[in-house]
Amino acid sequence: MRGPHVRHIHNFACHCLGLKAYFREPGDGRLHPHIPAHDLVWAVVIGRILRESSFLSLEWLTHSPVRAELGIRAEFGDDALAYSTERMDPEATRAALAGVLRQAKRNKAFENSPFIGLAIDGTGAGRTWKEPCSLCDPIRDAKGEVHGSLHHFVMISVVGAGLTLPIDVEPYGPGDSEYAAAQRLLPRAARNLGPRFANYLVGDGEYATAPFLHSTDEVGLPVVARLKENLPSLAAAVRARFDGQPPHAVFQEGNDRVEVWDADDFDPWETLQWSTVRVLRYRQHKSDGTLVQAEWLTDFPVAKLGSLSFYRMAKSRWEIENRGFNDGKNRYGMEHICHHEPNSILIVWLLIVLALVIERLYRLRHLHRGDHQIRSAMDLLTWLWLTLGSRSPPETG
């Protein structure tokens, strides 16, 4: 077969993922545009796939001999990217991302997984010492002195389905919070994805509050949340029930032995409008001798969800940490602020998410058709750079 090439990724995104209309009209807010919006947006997306994280590096690419091979027609500078991202409507990119996820589901990208999960979590990125913008959260030492600023956002991502695919991000600044941003993000993402897209939502202990759990009910998603000491009455009841008791079941997960305790008749706390609460405690004995124990709560009844599936849903939360935040920061440039303006920061974060989704669907599904081996992210990156100046990629075995 022909090897991967940047032009193939562009065609895959436009035609297989249905993004042609989005790249033509990506929510451009410029009144008198001279540079096609397609070129500006696609430059950011393909630049992140090529691990080029600054607007200056994109300016260099658009003035290089490989501009046409990148699928970009016009030359432009970093100032054009800054100007356009300041004025783009983020809702157009959010809608496009949700459309890609729906198309991926129709294309059976998740067909080997019994459940499709959504994970939600927050992080900080883009430390700066520049004049603060409205999203800048001051970094203070123990004496209260400010040492730069950090930008924060909440992400929601597909997890537990064989592919980790981020869907949307919501920024929050001073006077706001991760919790409040998540409450804005969840209903929007659920609305954009449509009913019955996912089977559950998983989150850390910060989201184990009655208002947030009721919000998941409103969007029709069962929830799996970490149980910590922020719910003291339930945590005490779990200890009283499970401590000193033999495990209800023991599983072998890979090289790890997992003991579980599982009960679905705990009383809800005063403000939670559930009839009962189900809690799973797992004790994971890793092959290196380490021990991991945690408790998780859910509104899934035992009749619909076994203990092993409950355990796997809880563990799927780590996907957003490892394959969302860590990959986004270390590989796709989420830590780098291209243009220090709130809307531009948000747009670039959303375009990074789009680049990550396109790259993973192309590499892990499109290139993996038939009996072709899965390429690593680094292998694909190397191949794309090696073939960038060639209109005809070499054959691959």
Language-model-detected regions and their locations in the chain:
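Basic, short loop/linker segments at the boundary and entry of helix-turn-helix/winged-helix-like folds
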Residues: 2-42
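Active-site-proximal, Lys/Arg-enriched surface segment
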Residues: 82-161
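An anionic, glycine-rich sequence signature occurring as long contiguous blocks
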Residues: 224-317
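Short, positively charged, Gly/Tyr-enriched micro-motifs
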Residues: 31-99, 216
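Electropositive, glycine- and tryptophan-enriched low-complexity nucleic-acid-binding patches
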Residues: 140-196
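A short, flexible helix-boundary coil/loop motif
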Residues: 1-7, 19-20, 249-267, 329-331, ...
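Short, conserved catalytic/metal-binding motifs centered on acidic residues
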Residues: 43-44, 58, 77, 81, ...
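Short amphipathic alpha-helical "interface-anchor" segments enriched in bulky aromatics
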Residues: 9-12, 58, 304-339
